[in-house]
Amino acid sequence: MQTIAAIAKLEEILTNNGISAQQALALLTTALPLATTSDPQEPLPPLLRALQTASDRLRQQQVGDTVTYVINRNINFTNICEQHCAFCAFRRDATASDAYWLNIETILSKVAEAVAQGATEICMQGGLNPAAKEGGSSLRYYQFLVREIKTAFPQIHLHAFSPQEIQFIAREDGCSYAQVIAALHEVGVDSMPGTAAEVLVDAVRSKICPEKIRTATWLEIVETAHRLGVWTTSTMLCGHIETPADQMAHLQHLQQLQQKALEHDYPARITEFILLPYVGELAPKAMRQWVGHHQPRLLPTLVLTAVARLFLGQWIVNHQPSWVKLGLRGATMALNWGCNDLGGTLMEEHITSVAGAQGGTGVSPEDLVAAIHSLGRTPQQRTTLYNPVGERQ
């Protein structure tokens, strides 16, 4: 405990602009069990209070008191998927009665609605549908989607297609990751979601998403995107079967990825880190049995949020909670544990909501602004790449 107490000293953390991987693991190993047995409504135990204070002060030191958000729309264009991830309640076989695959007219209508509501970003991802081809080519189909959207709405920032989707397209068409990313970037993909990361530890992936790309492939695709000038986000799926050591291995991979982008002076890098707590109310039975709880545990999520700021903050300065998974109240609490961004309005969300999330599928800019004001912070609308939109509010 003496080591943990030393780590928790606010002065040490602020002087060093963060903590080492060894210190972070020691904190997680001690703080997570404490958080699991503590009542979030009661006063925090001293260690958790010190952790919260340190992460909040480091956030203020690194990015200030402005809290950002983006007006965007999420479009999941198909739930047809060839994979069977243990945590996923979204995917369907093509023959399922509730399988869907949006046509381009519907997609463009959704984009038009978003633009009319002030959206600057469309986030678009979908299941891995082998039938999604244009002239026998997966890449041409994805290019068609992008080209149609950007032709009709050239002003919109298109944040689209995860590393898993990039690998899927490359496999289907027999081309390299670089060729796929470059071709999509050329027709209008502006940035890439850092999803499909789950936990970047193959022992975990082999159990919860055995058909997904391995850790090395995810890292290779994201680094390739940075090298080609495509910015990405980064994520972690937490609160299921992973251990504190797994969590730290994941954070170290992200830190090393960002460090490499900076050292090699790549034209793009990681814009933000988003912690995604597991929601499994309607997930497949095996995963629910492994995990033993169906909704996010708020205090352990906040502890990991804080440690992510302390370890990653000097490399990835923008940290975002998931209001879809935590609810807006929980996400607002995370702004006191190291986060400085509340994410997007989304307007619709299907992947988490069908798993039983209780946070909703869309939130208004006014609700985000009110949540930020409730903490005495200053709201600022932003672009996907964290440039300000309009005046501070």
Swiss-Prot record:
Pfam family for this entry, one: CofH_C
MF GO annotations: 4 iron, 4 sulfur cluster binding; 5-amino-6-(D-ribitylamino)uracil--L-tyrosine 4-hydroxyphenyl transferase activity; 7,8-didemethyl-8-hydroxy-5-deazariboflavin synthase activity; iron ion binding
Cofactor or coenzyme needed: [4Fe-4S] cluster
Enzyme class name: transferase
Key words of the record: 4Fe-4S, Iron, Iron-sulfur, Metal-binding, S-adenosyl-L-methionine, Transferase
Positions contributing to [4Fe-4S] cluster binding: C81, C85, C88
Gene3D superfamilies on file: Aldolase class I (3.20.20.70)
EC number: 2.5.1.147
Residue intervals of the Radical SAM core domain: 67-322
PROSITE patterns: RADICAL_SAM (PS51918)
InterPro entries xref list: Aldolase_TIM (IPR013785), CofH/MnqC-like_C (IPR045567), CofH_family (IPR019940), F420 (IPR034405), FO_synthase_su2 (IPR020050), rSAM (IPR007197)
Pathway linked to the protein: Cofactor biosynthesis; coenzyme F0 biosynthesis
Reaction(s) catalysed by this chain's protein: 5-amino-6-(D-ribitylamino)uracil + L-tyrosine + S-adenosyl-L-methionine = 5-amino-5-(4-hydroxybenzyl)-6-(D-ribitylimino)-5,6-dihydrouracil + 2-iminoacetate + 5'-deoxyadenosine + L-methionine + H(+)
Claim: Iron is one of the keywords in the record: yes
Cofactor: binding details: Binds 1 [4Fe-4S] cluster. The cluster is coordinated with 3 cysteines and an exchangeable S-adenosyl-L-methionine.
Top-level taxon: Bacteria
Keyword 4Fe-4S on entry: yes
Subunit details: Consists of two subunits, CofG and CofH.
Function: Catalyzes the radical-mediated synthesis of 5-amino-5-(4-hydroxybenzyl)-6-(D-ribitylimino)-5,6-dihydrouracil from 5-amino-6-(D-ribitylamino)uracil and L-tyrosine.
Family recorded in the similarity comment: Belongs to the radical SAM superfamily. CofH family.
Name the UniProt record assigns to this protein: 5-amino-6-(D-ribitylamino)uracil--L-tyrosine 4-hydroxyphenyl transferase
